[in-house]
From Swiss-Prot:
Coiled-coil annotated spans: none
Record-linked Gene3D superfamilies: Alpha-D-Glucose-1,6-Bisphosphate, subunit A, domain 3 (3.40.120.10), Alpha-D-phosphohexomutase, C-terminal domain (3.30.310.50)
Source organism of this protein record: Rhizobium etli (strain ATCC 51251 / DSM 11541 / JCM 21823 / NBRC 15573 / CFN 42)
Taxonomy of the source species: Bacteria, Pseudomonadati, Pseudomonadota, Alphaproteobacteria, Hyphomicrobiales
Cofactor list: Mg(2+)
PANTHER family to which the protein is assigned, alphabetical: PHOSPHOGLUCOMUTASE (ALPHA-D-GLUCOSE-1,6-BISPHOSPHATE-DEPENDENT), PHOSPHOHEXOSE MUTASE
NCBIfam families for this protein: glmM, PRK10887.1
Pfam families associated with the record: PGM_PMM_I (PF02878), PGM_PMM_II (PF02879), PGM_PMM_III (PF02880), PGM_PMM_IV (PF00408)
Protein name: Phosphoglucosamine mutase
Function: Catalyzes the conversion of glucosamine-6-phosphate to glucosamine-1-phosphate.
Cofactor remark: Binds 1 Mg(2+) ion per subunit.
A GO cellular-component term linked to this record: cytosol
Record-stated family: Belongs to the phosphohexose mutase family.
Amino acid sequence: MKRRYFGTDGIRGQSNVFPMTPDLAMRVGIAAGTIFRRGNHRHRVVIGKDTRLSGYMLENAMVAGFTAAGLDAFILGPIPTPAVAMLTRSLRCDIGVMISASHNPYEDNGIKLFGPDGYKLSDDIEAEIEDLLEKDLNAQLAKSDDIGRAKRVDGVHDRYIEHAKRTLPRDVTLQGLRVAIDCANGAAYKVAPAVLWELGADVVTIGNEPNGTNINLNCGSTSPVALQKKVDEVRADIGIALDGDADRVIIIDENGSIVDGDQLMAVIAESWAESQQLRGNGIVATVMSNLGLERFLDERGMALARTKVGDRYVVEHMRQHNYNVGGEQSGHIVLSDYGTTGDGLVAALQILAAVKRTGRTVSEVCRRFEPVPQLLRNVRISGGKPLEDIQVQKAIADAEAELARNGRLVIRPSGTEPLIRVMAEGDDRAQIERIVNELIGTISNVRTAA
């Protein structure tokens, strides 16, 4: 069944435009609060946000919704998404909320929900919330004497700082390393530099002056040019680029080259396998991860399990099959020994541990495999279902047959935008470009005809 509100990572959209309005945010609070208001204990919700201008508006709306449903609301202010997941558990809350649109520009915002175990909600529970949102919620309001209380909680940043520091092996310090970090003017602008400094690094920070409208603006993991320049300027050993809510990371090596999530997963998998920390004898990634990663792992006797796009699906597969390393090419790295969702800072600390233990440079540590040529293009759609068209399906089948075992083809609708994503990869770059261009043309023709 097609969902109206939830996408691959919660609810997301332009602020003050449906569905990302204060009215819907309040209704989500009532609906989600109703579902998690079970048992006789006093029910609680923890609410965090990033640094977007609209965060204050949506935070107040969600506090109103949850307290109207009878839950006490713990308000955290700007804090990373993985910290919200961690605090949902440690504060014994029934549900956790992160108000963020991750790597999107400030005009957008979103709502991510976590269960009491710190994991993102399942499709089934999100469907329950959607079902309630379509009904009259007045019947779900708490009695007058059961309305929840709202409280701003102090000291939560220190809790997350200590949690992140504990993920670095105790025999490792960051002394002697110059680390440049770009906080994307986002949720980690205070905590990330503090963690690195307390672990001994010489820290150079950019993207740590949020003003409500500059989150992810020419900074962060999706725009690493500023960090590349800073690494060169200060001769840093490594650059760490987080996104707006700090659940993803991209590394810049000492030469200014970008290291994506696939390479980071390869480093962590190999390092953890050597220390016998790796579970499942492999890792979990999405269909978008490079074929080079799969070959790298296979050569070392490790497996790559693939899921559909979205870190929540990576986490679900990890939980079901006892893996402890997973992630996405985009830099969502999930290390279940340390958390329940992607954590850019914790992932970066594992890379720093490998650098310190081996005594090698970041470029030497992080270039674990040669990626095969990969091309991703998007087709914007305004309606219809072009992937169900017979001509498109035949073109896809022909392309898959041509690639055979020498490449891969992934075609899927975006979970957050009105786009169809076409990705192909293989050893022959010219072949890949031709296949993608032909498929784009076929899909565009069908869309135009419709």
